[in-house]
Amino acid sequence: MSSPSMFDRISSPRQRLSNPLRSPPIREVSEYDLDELEPRSDDVLFDQEPPLPRLKKNMQHVSATSTRRSSSPASWDSKHRYSNSPPHTRSKPIFAGPPPPIASSMMMNQHPSRQSTVSSHGDNGRGYGLISASRFGSNSPSQKHVDNRPRLDSIWRSLQRREKALERDIQQLLDLQASGLIAGSGEGSESNFGSDTTTGESTFYSTATSKSRMMNSLHMPTRSTPDGNVIPVRQPVSNKPRGLKSTRVGLQRSMAALSDLKAEEDLHLSTALEQRKDALAYLDKMSKRRDDIYSELHALEDDEEEPLGQELRSLEAERQELDHDIQRLEEKLAGAKKRRRWVREKMEDVKGRREAGLSGYRAAGRDVDIEVRTLMQTPPIAPLDIDALGYGENTRPKENMDILRGTEFLQLRPERRTVEMARTWWQGEIAALERRKAQISQDRQALIEGSEVWSDVTGLVAQFEAKLRELVKSSQAGDADEEPQQAAMQSQLSEMDDVVQELQKRLQLAESKHWNLLICAIGAELEAFVEAKALLSDTLGLPEPAAAVDSPELSDSTDKAEGTSQEERADSHDESDNEVPADLLVSRMEDHDHDPPDSPQQQSVVLRRGSAGNNEVPVEFLADLHGPNKIEQDTEIAAVTRLMSK
């Protein structure tokens, strides 16, 4: 079940306080056969009367606990599903609710006192609001045990698991991309690895396999019960290999999913920061209020210029003077005694008024002390899991090692917790969350910039492949002369040099910003272009330029990409859980919004992938129109086109 929301936690303090006071009634031990169970009557959820027991025979002693447990969602579903069918045609449902808890009933009968304790702990485990009565009010007198165990927020580990899953998907897509590019640059030019269309052989194999599965047995298994309950059937896993086009699209989608995950984590971080800042502000407000009250109280007690204090001192002096006058003047004894009686009454009145004024401050100070003590016993914020935010034991900043963590604060006895400890705890968590938020913003910016770079790379590749494909079509049609075609192919070589230079610039940009994901992807595209260029140069019989082949930047970037891929492959092989290494996605790229279906980039990609294997004219049809040299040249040009399409 999901944790209660902020509004649910704020709006239900009475219900949360009243639940621990109510313990379920003790159920007598009863044992019966499970075959005698049947669904509840149709009006369990809507009648005001208590539900009947689930046994066919009359049972006199049925506890409220078993009655509540029998009202499971499965029983509600079966009740509504079979409510319209006649009772004589209703068959026994597949699942009519859980059986009565025999073993747990015996344990609860042996330990009746533990039920209330467990229920109170379970109620305390729910979410707390910042202004709930259980946090800042007085606790219930019947709640004797306080659960001091730290409860961590599980959303951070959930986000971490989702991020690791996306990283594994990205690693698989990178492996598929490398496999597709290697297969496209291999000797077998007619290999269709990674193509989006299936061959006749694979179709026949899948058809034969499906027929063998269907005809394995003459007995057809039951798909559903007579009442309409569908029996689930395990579906086979699709073994169809993904093509290079789908791999690139998958990389784009994975980057978009990773960007959405970062946005969600940023939202949770903002919420956590706001909660802790509110708690810290409330704590500062209470501390300031208490300090103001006590400072004013001490100032009033020690103020010699206070009117009531001065009046009290003057009356005391007058009383002493009157006592002396009584001793000296016996004739004035009657008047002096009367005056003394009046002065004493006046003193008592002044003392009472003064104490009444100071008692209000003392009561307010005691209330604040009680509220702060309650806040220290049950803090409104769950401890922050520093490890789930990406800080391991070795990568944790030095300042995080010195701060007081929430788990350490909650492990202390409540009477030993102080306001300074709570302030140190929340200030440290706020600093950690702010650092994580800054890192998330930096990662999102890197993802946006990297996605733009990848879009430029795919656009360059698609534009060049479209031009090369048009040239191959014109050469295979046989309408143009050989010399203009030779010049066009040489111009394609120069354009290929430009594309290689642009890819090298993008690769250098990715290396300068340590974008390992783009280094792998762009390096693979660059290597494919270099191989295609070499093949095209050999076809035309032109010497390959030394700058393009022996470029140190290209060799360094290619070696670096290959070394990174080999290290990542070795690390992923050594790890038992097949996780993506942490340094592969140091700067994770966030994909921009998906292009519309009619955008130039998607059209170029679709054109490059969709027309790669369908618009090629077989060499045999050109044997009558061209000589042997022309056929050989067209064959090699078609091989270059297929290599670029891979």
From Swiss-Prot:
Q: Effect of knocking it out?
A: Does not significantly decrease the growth rate under nutrient-rich conditions.
Enumerate the transmembrane spans.
none
Q: Where is this region: Disordered?
A: 1-148, 221-245, 475-494, 546-612
**Keywords of this entry:** Autophagy, Coiled coil, Cytoplasm, Cytoplasmic vesicle, Membrane, Vacuole
Its placement in the membrane is given as: Peripheral membrane protein
Q: Return the Basic and acidic residues bias intervals.
A: 557-575, 588-597
- Biological-process GO terms, alphabetical: autophagy
From what superkingdom does this record's organism come?
Answer: Eukaryota
Q: What would be one Gene Ontology cellular-component term for the protein?
A: vacuolar membrane
Q: Where is the composition biased (Low complexity)?
A: 63-75
Give its localization. Answer: Cytoplasm; Vacuole membrane; Cytoplasmic vesicle membrane
- Give me the stretches of Polar residues compositional bias: 12-21, 106-122
Tell me the protein family, please.
Answer: Belongs to the ATG28 family.
Q: What is this protein called?
A: Autophagy-related protein 28
Species per Swiss-Prot/TrEMBL record: Gibberella zeae (strain ATCC MYA-4620 / CBS 123657 / FGSC 9075 / NRRL 31084 / PH-1)
